[in-house]
From Swiss-Prot:
The chain crosses the membrane at residues 287-307, 318-338, 389-409, 427-447, 454-474, 506-526, 550-570. Its EC number is 3.4.24.-. Belongs to the peptidase M50B family. Keywords: Chloroplast, Coiled coil, Hydrolase, Membrane, Metalloprotease, Plastid, Protease, Transit peptide, Transmembrane, Transmembrane helix. It is an enzyme of class 3 (hydrolase). This is Probable zinc metalloprotease EGY3, chloroplastic. Residues 62-73 have a biased composition (Basic and acidic residues). GO terms for cellular component: chloroplast membrane. Residues 103-195 form a coiled coil. GO terms for molecular function: metallopeptidase activity. GO terms for biological process: proteolysis. Residues 1-54 form a transit peptide. The lineage of its organism: Eukaryota, Viridiplantae, Streptophyta, Embryophyta, Tracheophyta. Residues 62-118 are annotated as: Disordered.
Amino acid sequence: MSSSSLVTSLLFSSSSSSNTATSTSSRRSFSLFSKNQYCKPSPLRRSSSLLLVRCSLQQQQEEKAAPAAESHHAGGGQDDAATASHHAVEGENGVADADGGGVKKSKEELEEEEQQEVDWRSDEEFKRFMGNPSIEGAIKLEKKRADRKLRELDREPDANPLAGLLRGLARGQLAREKERLELAENTFKALDLNKLKSCFGYDTFFAVDVRRFGDGGIFIGNLRKPVEEVRPKLEKKIAEAAGTDVTLWFMEEKNDDITKQVCMVQPKAEIDLQLEITKLSTPWGYLSAVALAVTTFGTIAIMSGFFLKPGATFDDYVSDVLPLFAGFLSILGVSEIATRLTAARYGVKLSPSFLVPSNWTGCLGVMNNYESLLPNKKALFDIPVARAASAYLTSVALAVSAFVSDGSLNGGKNALFVRPEFFYNNPLLSFVQAVIGPYADELGNVLPNAVEGVGVPVDPLAFAGLLGIVVTSLNLLPCGRLEGGRIAQALFGRGAAAVLSFATSVALGAGAIIGGSVLCLAWGLFATFVRGGEEIPAQDEITPLGSERYAWGLVLAVVCLLTLFPNGGGTYSSDFLGAPFFRGGI
């Protein structure tokens, strides 16, 4: 893991080079504070250096307007004012005049200087900030710009009463902003790394090198005891030395095929601020969750109606569709409870649950964000596995209970007639077909008791189990912050997880373009852009997961692939899949 990946994981504002920074990207860096009213970005105006240049040039012009005799007489000894003016120009702009006299700037040169003042890339404070992004540096930049704007407003004349009133309002707003910045400056202070060095030792984490990272630092060394023993002891020592609470991460950093253990230290106030900004447990977040839940229930109800036989009445809808609806909600409910219980066991806070409505399967799963730090890789692995495993088990339990209650595989009295495309070209279901036979024809092209032009009779609860398996497998794809992406990050690290995420996005795109699958297109876009990225690092990424969790990961991967990957041979005849069967496609 390189240090650049750490910057991406833990800081909102970062840049690879000051030469590529723009005013737009700078404003993004400072939006970190706006939610808590610590600062608001204001445009950079002309600085005092430009005013000094203008003043110096004005003095030079006045000296040239003096009598020629006095000007020639000054050859033996220059006027003190001219000398001071020349030094001011030289100090502000780095221009050296060999004769010691004033040099009149052209209009183009002045415009260029003004543009440099407006351009944030010429700001030295900004350059230092981009070299090491930190909240303290951002506050200093905003405070400097607020002071500059206040001075600029104070110099403007109040000839127009209305303009004076507006300037007064702006001045008051800037003054309040400056007060907030001063308050934030007292809260967010960069840690003194020299003081922190003495906190590391042979009995905790032996540090051999340190480098600045944000307002904290990265200590390179090696761990001497298990993380669960070292972290509380070291956090207490560092907090006492720094005078503020801190948060620690223990990670492995790879450079030039050499793996080193590192301990990253950051002020706790800054991490709390970052978590506060991304928190979805707000009134708007809960309102959005309710709106998505209502929409998802509607799509499940609409999708369920597609499987009724022609000429079905409302009573048929109630008797046939409600079991499917209840089965789907059972899968979602059980998996949600398992997820939250597992997260609570590790002390991880979860955001509200956001259902993903779908016109194909009714629902494409549930989204949750982590609203607190993950203590270790076990938490990063166990929480998504709890959701996936519970959803799989509930789906299978529903299907088995439906078959047992019906006493057959025909769907019973209230069977849904499911389009065969839900079973087509899938290795897992093809295997099920081979086991449960007999087939309806000699060629083995259809499921038992299938009715051509109507579909395959399936019990509603059994079909809910099938949909639950498919939706769970979609969420197990190793892409972004889907459950599968989180599992991949826990098992293989962020670097390998990023490669798997990219490969999965490409595969989904290929399925959409080559195979013409709308589901691949929609899910690929959702997984890449809505749930893309990676989770914030766990505080302990050094302690290994153990072979048992790798085995569980392999089992889930096999089930996911068997459920989603097509098999080349197929199971159905082209006539059975063609018109006039379809009443709506996937």
